[in-house]
Amino acid sequence: SGDVSMRVLAFEDSYDIEKILVEGGVDLSDWELLQYWNTMDCFDRVEEFKPDLLLLDHYIPPIKGLEVLRGLLELVAANQIQRPRMILGISSSSAANEAMEHAGADGSIGKFQLAKHEVWKN
């Protein structure tokens, strides 16, 4: 991808996503990763950072991942925010991840398997 880095925005309140990825062998040199440990002002944060990849935990305060996703997609539909190229649910709960996929996420993966996702191999 040349010298253009891909931008990753993660909403995850319990685990350091960068640490999970690096320990899983992902080379993050082409990625710019930003993690927020809560979902305060989440839509403003997405709008400011303009991520290529959005990672959403479900059980995170104050707004759960599923509600963040629904709200975000409403704003996208209203042309008020640019949709990230890929949105992944990264809950440890497969039921929560399935719910996010039904609501419009592009996919999901348990956060501890995240380093194995094909998105890092591009």
Label for each model-derived stretch:
Residues 28-34:
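A generic structural motif
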Residues 35-53:
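Acidic, metal-coordinating helix/loop segments flanking the phosphotransfer/catalytic sites
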Residues 5-17, 21-25:
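Conserved acidic segment of CheY-like receiver
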Residues 45-48, 118, 122:
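CheY-like receiver
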Residues 67, 89-117, 121:
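Alpha4 helix (beta4-alpha4-beta5 surface) of REC/receiver domains from two-component response regulators
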Residues 23-27, 45, 99, 103:
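Alpha-helical interaction/dimerization surfaces of two-component signaling modules
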Residues 52, 77-87:
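His-Asp phosphorelay/catalytic-motif detector in bacterial-type signaling
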Residues 52-76:
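Conserved phosphotransfer microenvironments
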